[in-house]
Amino acid sequence: MARIAGIDIPREKRVVISLTYIYGVGKSTAAKILEEANVSPDTRVKDLTDDELGRIRETVDAYKVEGDLRREQNLNIKRLMEISSYRGIRHRRGLPVRGQKTKNNARTRKGPVKTVANKKK
């Protein structure tokens, strides 16, 4: 397996697909990286030369991926919580942040149902 940005990418897959195993790199970003590195997207990872791998590594290093990206996202959320913005308060309470309704659903964000004891109609 080839290591790019600290991640072992699969050898048997095409390079454009293998790059998506890196956090922060999707299909379109992978295609851009390969275009900048001048590598064919249809090449298998096992068939890449050391020179091509080096060019891909240099190009990926220019992007914010893996730990740096995760750290930046966490810091952004913490900043929102510290300034007590609406979004920060929603993050703190564990509720949906982007304006979704919460009367009936939002179970993913709210967690399992907390039943109220002795509630009679």
UniProtKB/Swiss-Prot annotation:
Residues 91-121 are annotated as: Disordered. GO terms for biological process: translation. The keyword DNA damage does not apply. Pfam families: Ribosomal_S13. Keywords: Ribonucleoprotein, Ribosomal protein, RNA-binding, rRNA-binding, tRNA-binding. Located at the top of the head of the 30S subunit, it contacts several helices of the 16S rRNA. In the 70S ribosome it contacts the 23S rRNA (bridge B1a) and protein L5 of the 50S subunit (bridge B1b), connecting the 2 subunits; these bridges are implicated in subunit movement. Contacts the tRNAs in the A and P-sites. This is Small ribosomal subunit protein uS13. It comes from Staphylococcus carnosus (strain TM300).
